[in-house]
Amino acid sequence: MRATIVFQGQILEPDAFERRVLRSAAVLRSVGIGEGDVVAMLMRNSPEAMEVMVATRHLGAQWCPVNWHFKTDEVQFILADSGAKVLIADAALLSALGGLQTGDAKLWTVRGSVPEAAAWEPVRDAMPSLDALPAAPRGAMFYTSGTTGRPKGIVREPMTPAQAEASVAMRRAAYGIESPLRALLTAPWYHSAPNGFALGVVLDGGTLYIEERFDAERTLRLIDEHRLTHAYLVPTMYVRMLALPAPVRARYDLGSMRFVSSTGSPCPPDVKRAMIDWWGPVINECYGASELGYMTLLTSAQALQKPGSAGAPLPGVVLKILDDNGRELPAGTPGLIYIHQPATPDFSYVGNAEARARMEVGGLKTMGDIGYLDDDGFLFIVDRKADMVISGGVNIYPVEIEIALQGMPGVADCAVFGIPDDEFGEALAAAVQPAAGAVVTADAVRAWLSERIAGYKVPRIVSLHAELPREDTGKIFKRKLREPYWAGRARNV
């Protein structure tokens, strides 16, 4: 916990950060938080988010980051489904959620106050530090979008000592963490990858510069001014920085950077090459999942040799390509990607044992991605068996959007799917079949959805169809809707 946190020009030195973590742990313990309990966190990137996360980990409890773009109903579901005993929320975010019912969960706010909740900081500062050894860490309870239309909560088993040691090695490989380091966090910490990046820096005793949101030129300025060494960025951020005028890009010295980690969505080879040409051989890409951890790593040198690859398995990782019958496929033959990552404790889904069981074959687990290994053992991802869309590094399952849209008057049926986007990797498109005699417009569709789901889930493209293409079974033929958008692309994700 000997980390330094820098936020909005204020420096939280290691002694002060450790004191706040142990006082936060004492507050949580005082309301009954212990091993296996859940602390929900509706918080923007901030020092308070880091201290509550580490305090929860210290108690062997699970921190449950909540996407701050979610609407009231979405937050309500996660609170109820996770069984969270505590919700700590940014006051501004909580105020924007009208009618949120927290049930029996204890509610605190940070960075402001609201009438219905106590402010966190005064309670924390008045509490003596917890004097107790840390419990076995359980990790975060991330909610990952699911094909049922509701997200699934990931419940981790406690880490064994061997897994704890292996997880340190995994984070160091995936994020390039090595002391001393000065790291930059600009991606939303509620996603598993930036969350793991921030946690790794803090546990390693590094200096973490926290930004509430990403800004292309400000990122360059921070690297230059503070001689930052590490960052977690996603391809969308690369695109935005590359779009800056050449004189702006040339203004900043980025030579201090040693390791940039990227994951979430595939990085187009031309974007990666442009970043390597600009920043040098410090651009790295991982393939991973909230459930399974990091699986592969692709360095800059490897990216230039094998454009389009997702990398080679990390040390200790078992990666196999299997057919639908569980048979291993030879190099060059696409199939389902199955993984075993020994650094990641086993998990279950809250109330969904069936979905968890479907993932596993012979001790290996799959997220439903389709790919192949080349003769050198490098992974190439070519498609997804599931319908998940990754836009700007965010996982989105269309079924949730389809359920919301099917409730719109005048809509007979619909299909939501991913289409290529140069900035975000993928964008959402909706194909809508109006009911007989109904008048439905694209603007009306977007307005309907905007009132019911987070803004990033609202499709950018809405097309209207007299009849949607269907398979013999009557199921909508999404592939026929997607294909025209992906024509001429090297891959379909």
Residue locations for each model-derived region?
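Conserved AMP-binding/adenylate-forming core of the ANL superfamily
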Residues: A3-S46, M50-V54, K71-Q76
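Gly/Ser/Thr-rich phosphate-binding loop
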Residues: A140-F142, G146, L203, T229-Y232, ...
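AMP-binding/adenylate-forming catalytic core of the ANL superfamily
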Residues: A49, F70, L87-A89, R221-I223, ...
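Conserved AMP-binding/adenylation subdomain of ANL enzymes
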Residues: A162-R182, T186, Y190-T229, L244
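Structural core segment of the AMP-binding/adenylate-forming
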Residues: S30-V31, V54, H58-R124, D131-P134, ...
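Conserved pre-ATP/AMP-binding loop-to-beta segment of ANL
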Residues: D125-Y143, G149-R150, G176-R182
